[in-house]
Amino acid sequence: MTASTEAAVVVLAAGAGTRMRSDTPKVLHTLAGRGMLAHVLHTVSEIDARHLVAVLGHDRERIAPEVARLSEELGRAIDVAVQDQQLGTGHAVNCGLTALPHDFAGMVVVTSGDVPLLDTATLTGLITSHGSGDAAATVLTTTLPDPTGYGRILRTQDHEIIGIVEQADATESQRTICEVNTGVYAFDIADLRSALTRLRSDNAQHELYLTDVVEILRQDHRTVRALHVDDSALVTGVNDRVQLSDLGKVLNRRIVAAHQRAGVTIIDPGSTWIDIDVQIGQDTVVHPGTQLLGATRVGSHCVIGPDTTLTHVTVGDGASVVRTHGSESVIGAGATVGPFTYLRPGTNLGADGKLGAFVETKNCTIGTGTKVPHLTYVGDADIGEYSNIGASSVFVNYDGENKSRTTIGSHVRTGSDTMFVAPVTVGDGAYTGAGTVLRDDVPPGALAVSAGPQRNIEGWVAKKRPGSAADKAARKALGDES
């Protein structure tokens, strides 16, 4: 049996998730830059099942758009089945089966939308194990030191599975069992359909439990097998924010380790957070306190951090980014950024450029080799190559109603405290004096100076601040001790 021709996957995402205590649907809470449901759908899409169904119920009007987005992103159809009333997992699976063609006769894989670390290898192993035998159902199990909240696996003395008992219905003796149901199964569809029609809700939660299918199949003298997963994190579900945080740490450690094995030096894995879609080139060094988020792309031989957060930022080979907060920006090869630099969306720094201490940029293009060393705001601007912007300069882009653009050419040198009142253009090779307020265009090669001649008013301190410390110091410097 092959997964691509014989399997359908049903993902259960209909529950209310009340223990999350959140306005956000549980399956949309994120780990490593992806929602839990996105993690699961990414995984199940990789096994190339013939049909993929998401069962939605509570908050489906908010979850359905995410399913549609993922369907487009993954390039495959994801059917949506609706569970209008939350009557239990058995009822949810029955709703999911209604989305399959009536003549589908293959294997049905069932998983939950809140098992974010489930991987392709584990699912493939389940499908292979189930397809190679005569079992009507195969259950993924794992062993937990604290199984509280999970259904327990009931076995005979010969270790055959005879049932699954939910926590609420378990006896004290059964609650000591540490082998648990993960909520991931493979079924033959005919046996599954038959068993679902016989589910009863006479249990502690008055629901139709999918787990009761195991006992029904055993009563039908059908074989039920278990496939044990040693790495319990792969099949651990999330019910509250503590579990979300715990699994997030596990996933982050695995992401960090994968980058390390691929040739990235990460000084302190415990303080470094890297989202699942981030790419990092070989021989890059990541220092403590760094977060690389979203679709960030970092080249080879870079230095990132410490204390740096980059979200959807592309960093070229050999760049250095220190104590910087950046989003939706591009940093060119060999460029230097930081410390204490703020890159807002739309920043594009060219190769070998520099953005130094306490520089903020937004919606700007800064050319190759251009330097903005310190204490400057650059917004809505285009700067050419190999220019230098003096300290404490401001690109004055907003008049209270409209934002305008500033254009600065190549090989320009601007003095400290230059104000660029947009819209304004500074031509190639031009200079500005310190303290200049530019309201008019500057021709190529010109020097722009807006400040008037300096006036020194002799004796002003003696007249206006007589007897002050300044007056005494001035008199002493002038040799007037009177």
Curated annotation (Swiss-Prot):
<dbReference type="GO" id="GO:0019134">
    <property type="term" value="F:glucosamine-1-phosphate N-acetyltransferase activity"/>
</dbReference>
<feature type="region of interest" description="N-acetyltransferase">
    <location>
        <begin position="263"/>
        <end position="482"/>
    </location>
</feature>
<feature type="region of interest" description="Disordered">
    <location>
        <begin position="463"/>
        <end position="482"/>
    </location>
</feature>
<keyword id="KW-0511">Multifunctional enzyme</keyword>
<dbReference type="GO" id="GO:0003977">
    <property type="term" value="F:UDP-N-acetylglucosamine diphosphorylase activity"/>
</dbReference>
<feature type="binding site">
    <location>
        <begin position="397"/>
        <end position="398"/>
    </location>
    <ligand>
        <name>acetyl-CoA</name>
    </ligand>
</feature>
<dbReference type="GO" id="GO:0009252">
    <property type="term" value="P:peptidoglycan biosynthetic process"/>
</dbReference>
<dbReference type="Pfam" id="PF00132">
    <property type="entry name" value="Hexapep"/>
</dbReference>
<feature type="binding site">
    <location>
        <position position="166"/>
    </location>
    <ligand>
        <name>UDP-N-acetyl-alpha-D-glucosamine</name>
    </ligand>
</feature>
<feature type="compositionally biased region" description="Basic and acidic residues">
    <location>
        <begin position="472"/>
        <end position="482"/>
    </location>
</feature>
<feature type="binding site">
    <location>
        <position position="26"/>
    </location>
    <ligand>
        <name>UDP-N-acetyl-alpha-D-glucosamine</name>
    </ligand>
</feature>
<dbReference type="GO" id="GO:0000902">
    <property type="term" value="P:cell morphogenesis"/>
</dbReference>
<feature type="binding site">
    <location>
        <begin position="88"/>
        <end position="89"/>
    </location>
    <ligand>
        <name>UDP-N-acetyl-alpha-D-glucosamine</name>
    </ligand>
</feature>
<feature type="binding site">
    <location>
        <position position="388"/>
    </location>
    <ligand>
        <name>UDP-N-acetyl-alpha-D-glucosamine</name>
    </ligand>
</feature>
<feature type="binding site">
    <location>
        <position position="83"/>
    </location>
    <ligand>
        <name>UDP-N-acetyl-alpha-D-glucosamine</name>
    </ligand>
</feature>
<keyword id="KW-0460">Magnesium</keyword>
<comment type="pathway">
    <text>Nucleotide-sugar biosynthesis; UDP-N-acetyl-alpha-D-glucosamine biosynthesis; UDP-N-acetyl-alpha-D-glucosamine from N-acetyl-alpha-D-glucosamine 1-phosphate: step 1/1.</text>
</comment>
<comment type="subunit">
    <text>Homotrimer.</text>
</comment>
<feature type="binding site">
    <location>
        <position position="239"/>
    </location>
    <ligand>
        <name>Mg(2+)</name>
    </ligand>
</feature>
<keyword id="KW-0133">Cell shape</keyword>
<keyword id="KW-0573">Peptidoglycan synthesis</keyword>
<dbReference type="GO" id="GO:0016020">
    <property type="term" value="C:membrane"/>
</dbReference>
<dbReference type="InterPro" id="IPR001451">
    <property type="entry name" value="Hexapep"/>
</dbReference>
<keyword id="KW-0963">Cytoplasm</keyword>
<feature type="region of interest" description="Pyrophosphorylase">
    <location>
        <begin position="1"/>
        <end position="241"/>
    </location>
</feature>
<feature type="binding site">
    <location>
        <position position="362"/>
    </location>
    <ligand>
        <name>UDP-N-acetyl-alpha-D-glucosamine</name>
    </ligand>
</feature>
<feature type="binding site">
    <location>
        <position position="181"/>
    </location>
    <ligand>
        <name>UDP-N-acetyl-alpha-D-glucosamine</name>
    </ligand>
</feature>
<protein>
    <recommendedName>
        <fullName>Bifunctional protein GlmU</fullName>
        <ecNumber>2.7.7.23</ecNumber>
        <ecNumber>2.3.1.157</ecNumber>
    </recommendedName>
</protein>
<dbReference type="GO" id="GO:0005737">
    <property type="term" value="C:cytoplasm"/>
</dbReference>
<feature type="active site" description="Proton acceptor">
    <location>
        <position position="374"/>
    </location>
</feature>
<feature type="binding site">
    <location>
        <position position="344"/>
    </location>
    <ligand>
        <name>UDP-N-acetyl-alpha-D-glucosamine</name>
    </ligand>
</feature>
<feature type="binding site">
    <location>
        <position position="239"/>
    </location>
    <ligand>
        <name>UDP-N-acetyl-alpha-D-glucosamine</name>
    </ligand>
</feature>
<keyword id="KW-0479">Metal-binding</keyword>
<dbReference type="GO" id="GO:0009245">
    <property type="term" value="P:lipid A biosynthetic process"/>
</dbReference>
<dbReference type="InterPro" id="IPR011004">
    <property type="entry name" value="Trimer_LpxA-like_sf"/>
</dbReference>
<comment type="function">
    <text>Catalyzes the last two sequential reactions in the de novo biosynthetic pathway for UDP-N-acetylglucosamine (UDP-GlcNAc). The C-terminal domain catalyzes the transfer of acetyl group from acetyl coenzyme A to glucosamine-1-phosphate (GlcN-1-P) to produce N-acetylglucosamine-1-phosphate (GlcNAc-1-P), which is converted into UDP-GlcNAc by the transfer of uridine 5-monophosphate (from uridine 5-triphosphate), a reaction catalyzed by the N-terminal domain.</text>
</comment>
<comment type="similarity">
    <text>In the C-terminal section; belongs to the transferase hexapeptide repeat family.</text>
</comment>
<feature type="binding site">
    <location>
        <position position="391"/>
    </location>
    <ligand>
        <name>acetyl-CoA</name>
    </ligand>
</feature>
<comment type="similarity">
    <text>In the N-terminal section; belongs to the N-acetylglucosamine-1-phosphate uridyltransferase family.</text>
</comment>
<keyword id="KW-0808">Transferase</keyword>
<feature type="binding site">
    <location>
        <begin position="112"/>
        <end position="114"/>
    </location>
    <ligand>
        <name>UDP-N-acetyl-alpha-D-glucosamine</name>
    </ligand>
</feature>
<feature type="binding site">
    <location>
        <position position="151"/>
    </location>
    <ligand>
        <name>UDP-N-acetyl-alpha-D-glucosamine</name>
    </ligand>
</feature>
